[in-house]
């Protein structure tokens, strides 16, 4: 494993990653989307792996760019739109009208 990636294993907060790479970030975006940002960063790392033999300067620059991209995804969009986690991927096309919900609740109330 690349030494830069090894150092990341000790981090637990999104802010630690962002500070380590010197990525400027919006605290309000990170507060709401921290897990989404880290998951997206991991997805980007999987698509553009950092080889074990990549020099530290290049590895740092690569990771910084990928983390900045992950953060910026959630500046411009929402977690539901980005669909990083499965719970958001399963929501497409599933909506329930308010009238349908009211009718369902009324039917349940009659059975009780």
Curated annotation (Swiss-Prot):
Protein's UniProt keywords contain Membrane: no
Cited Pfam families: NifW
Keyword entries, A-Z: Nitrogen fixation
Coiled coil: none
Organism domain of life: Bacteria
Stored InterPro entries: NifW (IPR004893)
GO annotation (BP), single: nitrogen fixation
Chain's role: May protect the nitrogenase Fe-Mo protein from oxidative damage.
Entry similarity comment: Belongs to the NifW family.
Record's subunit section: Homotrimer; associates with NifD.
Official protein name in the record: Nitrogenase-stabilizing/protective protein NifW
Source species: Methylococcus capsulatus (strain ATCC 33009 / NCIMB 11132 / Bath)
Lineage of the organism: Bacteria, Pseudomonadati, Pseudomonadota, Gammaproteobacteria, Methylococcales
């Amino acid at each position: 494993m690349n030494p830069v990636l090894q150092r990341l294993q000790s981090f637990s907060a999104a802010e630690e990653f962002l500070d380590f790479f010197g990525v400027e970030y919006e605290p309000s975006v990170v507060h709401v989307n921290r897990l989404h940002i880290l998951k997206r960063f991991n997805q980007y790392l999987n698509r553009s792996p950092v080889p074990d033999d990549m020099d530290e300067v290049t590895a740092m620059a690569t990771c910084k760019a990928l983390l900045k991209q992950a953060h910026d995804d959630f500046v411009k969009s929402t977690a539901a739109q980005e669909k990083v986690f499965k719970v958001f991927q399963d929501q497409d096309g599933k909506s329930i009208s308010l009238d349908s919900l009211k009718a369902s609740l009324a039917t349940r109330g009659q059975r009780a």
